[in-house]
Curated annotation (Swiss-Prot):
Its EC number is 1.7.1.13. It catalyses: 7-aminomethyl-7-carbaguanine + 2 NADP(+) = 7-cyano-7-deazaguanine + 2 NADPH + 3 H(+). The gene is queF. This is NADPH-dependent 7-cyano-7-deazaguanine reductase. Belongs to the GTP cyclohydrolase I family. QueF type 2 subfamily. The keyword Lipid biosynthesis does not apply. It comes from Escherichia coli O17:K52:H18 (strain UMN026 / ExPEC). It comes from the Bacteria. Catalyzes the NADPH-dependent reduction of 7-cyano-7-deazaguanine (preQ0) to 7-aminomethyl-7-deazaguanine (preQ1). Substrate binds at I88, E89, S90, H229, E230. The active site is at C190, D197. NADPH binds at S90, K91, R258, G259. One of its GO terms (biological process) is tRNA modification.
Amino acid sequence: MSSYANHQVLAGLTLGKSTDYRDTYDASLLQGVPRSLNRDPLGLKADNLPFHGTDIWTLYELSWLNAKGLPQVAVGHVELDYTSANLIESKSFKLYLNSFNQTRFNNWDEVRQTLERDLSTCAQGKVSVALYRLDELEGQPIGHFNGTCIDDQDITIDNYEFTTDYLENATSGEKVVEETLVSHLLKSNCLITHQPDWGSIQIQYRGRQIDREKLLRYLVSFRHHNEFHEQCVERIFNDLLRFCQPEKLSVYARYTRRGGLDINPWRSNSDFVPSTTRLVRQ
């Protein structure tokens, strides 16, 4: 269990509670979670973070009415900056988007501006929003993470409790390598409901070579770990930086969707550019 799982801030969330669905616009449905909840225990300070990055959200269930009452549908792309005070709690985001369903907007840009304003207010930070018509995305290929997949290892695992022990002495030799490693075995659980969160992760680094077996065991140890997606990515970045001490490091996870939303956080201390094409499980 995370050290802050019972924090009073989390007690006020709608997540894990029975809620009514509203179909007329209501910005108050959005709820933020302070990033400091998991950053403080990791020793990460807002004014001296070892990374940059964004939380990339894809909105698959977004609909509203135009000025004449005709329903509109779109796919939304949201990027929430790592410097924001809060992350956006996903169930509240879903409830908020549902409140657009029977609300009239004059045009698409009004919808985009409304989303950007409300999300920025909730996150207390920079947020960008783009809306796409369905025909703009039709035929878009399924993407994949570039890199070497480390999943096909003939190893025995019988412990699924989170630990950083596997990263102790996880680098070898003095030779500096630059490589990208990929795993599709990342599974953590919602901090509140403990529902499973399934993801693929890409780790790009420059430094002493990381032992792939130890890295895979470390990633598998998240299987019983309860944290939000964004928090897991920052924990992984921080642990790799601490134990493996790479010169450059980027960590990018793309999670499967729930409630019409997928969350894809990345953190980097280099010039990393994330691919935003959905993966096969998304």
